[in-house]
């Protein structure tokens, strides 16, 4: 499971950072890739990666500001041009209005897609659990921005315990169908009458990962709720230390406020993105150092960077 950042800038693209988009790679878990926001130029950023557009099965939009959605029509159109590849349907989750934006753009441009788009829109009264599969659950909650904006909490369900094959062989169980039965939790009896209790050879279930991805926001209690005990928190840092008044005025956060959220939520790792073009490379180092005085395990991500979860 990995996060790859396609755009880490704020508001408008710069030479160093494109506007907002990232993907959660779940190839080993479910052979899918989930995208979060799709700012202008996202499809071009994908060309610099190994991501296959047809593998992107779900897109989660945090809010309807242009730097988070203007790349959608182009990406969806280009996704249909994957020659010799199977066309796969796609689901888009986001605030009410995202369907109208996408369909209007496709209609006006005369774009015809060979696959289906399923929209899942929500407003302030329909948040909470927005998706559940056999392996993942996704929650959304309202943040505090200048327009309706949400954050997402992606929870992987507990993983099955692993079979201790060496211990099982030592108990006299031959490799083959009996192994499969024990792996599936079924007790067996060997030819000599020895009873094998499956639970004795399977480790306890392993807790799944939790990833929190926030849209644009001021520091707010819902950010903490979404991030409680998360393995990774992706939080915006449009502004730096000392810019709290400016951040509040424009509906954003500073690096220090993001670190406070991470500390209060008890997350394992904080990844800062949505960085203003005002910050040069040397400023990024200071931004990280300042935030680390509040929450130690913090990193400011850059475009195309991939983080293992």
From Swiss-Prot:
Signal peptide (residue range): none
Alphabetized Pfam families for the sequence: Lactamase_B
Reactions it catalyzes: Endonucleolytic cleavage of RNA, removing extra 3' nucleotides from tRNA precursor, generating 3' termini of tRNAs. A 3'-hydroxy group is left at the tRNA terminus and a 5'-phosphoryl group is left at the trailer molecule
Residues that coordinate or bind Zn(2+) 1: 63, 65, 145, 216
PANTHER family: ZINC PHOSPHODIESTERASE ELAC PROTEIN 1 (PTHR46018:SF2)
General function of this protein: Zinc phosphodiesterase, which displays some tRNA 3'-processing endonuclease activity. Probably involved in tRNA maturation, by removing a 3'-trailer from precursor tRNA.
Protein name, per record: Ribonuclease Z
Organismal lineage: Bacteria, Bacillati, Bacillota, Bacilli, Lactobacillales
Gene that encodes the chain: rnz
């Amino acid at each position: 499971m990995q996060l790859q950042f396609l755009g880490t800038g704020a508001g408008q693209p710069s030479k160093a950072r494109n506007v907002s988009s990232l993907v959660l790679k779940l190839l080993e878990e479910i052979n899918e890739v989930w995208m979060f926001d799709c700012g202008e130029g996202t499809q071009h950023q994908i060309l610099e990666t190994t991501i296959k557009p047809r593998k992107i099965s779900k897109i989660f939009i945090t809010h309807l500001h242009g730097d988070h959605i203007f790349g959608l029509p182009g990406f969806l159109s280009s996704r249909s041009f994957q020659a010799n590849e199977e066309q796969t349907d796609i689901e888009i989750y986001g605030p009410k209005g995202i369907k109208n934006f996408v369909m209007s753009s496709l209609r006006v441009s005369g774009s015809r897609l060979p696959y289906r788009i399923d929209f899942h829109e929500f407003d302030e009264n329909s948040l909470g659990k927005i998706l559940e599969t056999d392996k993942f659950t996704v929650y959304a909650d309202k943040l505090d921005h200048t327009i309706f904006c949400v954050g997402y909490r992606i929870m992987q369900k507990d993983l099955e315990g692993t079979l201790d094959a060496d211990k099982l062989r030592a108990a006299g169980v031959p490799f083959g169908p009996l192994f499969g039965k024990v792996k599936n939790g079924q007790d067996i009896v060997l030819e000599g009458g020895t009873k094998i209790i499956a639970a004795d050879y399977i480790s306890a279930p392993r807790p799944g990962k939790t990833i929190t991805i926030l849209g644009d926001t001021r520091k707010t209690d819902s950010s903490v709720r979404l991030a409680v005990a998360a393995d990774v928190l992706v939080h915006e840092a449009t502004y730096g230390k000392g810019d709290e008044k400016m951040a509040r005025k424009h509906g954003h956060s500073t690096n220090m406020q993001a670190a406070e959220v991470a500390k209060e939520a008890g997350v394992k790792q904080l990844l800062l993105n949505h960085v203003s073009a005002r910050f040069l490379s040397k400023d990024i180092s200071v931004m990280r150092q300042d935030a680390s005085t509040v929450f130690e395990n913090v990193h400011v991500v850059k475009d195309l960077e991939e983080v293992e979860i």
